[in-house]
Amino acid sequence: MKATLFALLYGDYPELHKRLLGSLARYAPRNRIEVRLWLNTVSSETKARVKMLGFQSFDSAENLPKYTVMRRLFHGSPIKTPWIIWFDDDSYIERFDWFRQTEAVLRKHPEVSCLGEPWRHEWFPGQWDFVTGCPWYAGLPPALNGGNPGIIFPIGAYFWLKTEAILRLDWPHEDIAHAHNGGDYFFAEAMRQQNMRFLPFNHGVAINSASRRGRNEVPIGCTVDVREVPRRFETGKSPSTILNRKRRQFP
């Protein structure tokens, strides 16, 4: 199995980037994984490290939104592998058998289109109306999670995704390409609408393992400003909100 690994690095955080880049150099097999990096206004130290490691990179002097970057990376150059892997720069590989174990799970479940760490989101006001206006909406009513309309989604800081799913859904589509907050759960809903399966699984990757640095913007599709909902961000922990605080347990 071969994959193209994409990662978005941004800002003057050379130690954070050193951690991710070092883990890729140690644990991402070069004969199986092609690495493509997007560098959003990063430090000269990070640029030098990327060059030293020989990773392909795209340098931006502007701090572009995440889904704009995804759109350019996924559709700007041909992807020749059946799978893509995504990393935010605050996630990193911490186990030597990360690739082997994940590959084994995917071979065991060929019907799966996406793999990652699961979280539950309950739709904010206006978001389901946004869903029904999307080109991938196929008429399914909202799923009920915990008794309320919502979606189980892969945390956007690290996931595996079939290349054919990106092309079929034209993801990220133009309606969200300008945004930063909320695309991961809309992608999960797009897959559900199109009968694509998400498999909750993570072996060997530390996710969101840094204090929050990103934009604090209203989530995609919201008709109310929910940014006043208290958030808790702890180093080494994934973020949670009041509406999203209970993590679902999977076998």
Locations of the language-model features?
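Short, acidic, metal-binding catalytic loop of nucleotide-sugar glycosyltransferases
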Residues: 19-32
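Conserved catalytic core of nucleotide-sugar-dependent glycosyltransferases
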Residues: 94-175
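Glycine-rich, basic loop-to-helix element that forms the pyrophosphate-binding segment
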Residues: 61-76
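N-proximal low-complexity "stem/linker" segments adjacent to membrane-targeting elements
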Residues: 1-22
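A conserved acidic beta->alpha catalytic loop
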Residues: 38-47
